[in-house]
């Protein structure tokens, strides 16, 4: 086996790890994450989400939410969790609930991207 083969990255495994890490920081359970990406929480335990799948696309959007929020609050994890659980007049609800639908997830992400643009 060559060195290149030994270091080949499995994108599906990396995506699950990134999703689980983002969810942990945002105060989300595996059940919550499963609701966002449309999979049972047991699917997350198996450790693979194909990036090109519908679930993979939703996982990538949630990771973008995490990254945008991280920038806005300077990485303060307590503030990130607070923001997710606080009613937001601009997004029209609780972000932690809104992200469980595709429309809500995109609304929250668009809001965060717009706020980041003001920095």
List the model feature ranges, each with a label.
Residues 1-119:
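Non-transmembrane "mature" sequence context
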């Amino acid at each position: 086996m060559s060195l290149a083969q030994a270091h080949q990255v499995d994108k599906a495994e990396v995506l699950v790890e990134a999703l689980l890490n983002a969810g942990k920081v945002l105060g989300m359970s595996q059940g919550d994450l499963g609701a966002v990406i449309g999979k049972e929480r047991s699917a997350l335990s198996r450790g693979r989400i194909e990036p090109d799948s519908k679930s993979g696309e939703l996982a990538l959007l949630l990771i973008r939410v995490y990254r945008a929020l991280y920038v806005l609050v300077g990485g303060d994890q307590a503030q990130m969790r607070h923001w997710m659980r606080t009613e937001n007049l601009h997004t029209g609800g609780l972000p932690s609930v809104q992200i469980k639908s595709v429309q809500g997830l995109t609304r929250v992400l668009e809001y965060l991207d717009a706020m980041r643009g003001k920095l």
